[in-house]
Amino acid sequence: YLMRQLFAAPFRELDQIQNKIDEVEEEAFEGREKKMLEEVALLKQKVLDFRRAVKPQQLTLESLLSQGTNFYGESVKPFLTDLVGEYLKVWNLLENHKETLDALYDTTNSLLAAKTNEVMRAFTILAFISFIPINFGHIYCFHML
């Protein structure tokens, strides 16, 4: 029972992360790419920290499943199998969150790059348009001297 509760706790945290990912997905195309990029980076860090905490438990649980039946008897095998199943659910959710955040990061980064390109295009056009009158002014000014 205690071990099952230990694996139930991460689901609450993963649900909070999922809710935040959903919020970021909804806001990603509303023109706040820089803020979204920061939020996605923070969420990626949370998921990475979570993965670092959960991954080492895999070997422990697999060892417990194989050796626990020898020590406690075959009657505990279904419970240990359930624990491994809970672990796999947590790990699969973390993998899903990681992939979603990677895709969101790439998308948001692309949107930010597209906006930057638009600004650079506008500045290039402005520079070209202002170059011609400035050149004529300089040429005319030199001829006056």
Q: Each predicted region: which residue ranges?
A:
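Divalent-cation
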Residues: Y1
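Membrane-associated alpha-helical segments
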Residues: L6, L14-D15, D22-Y140
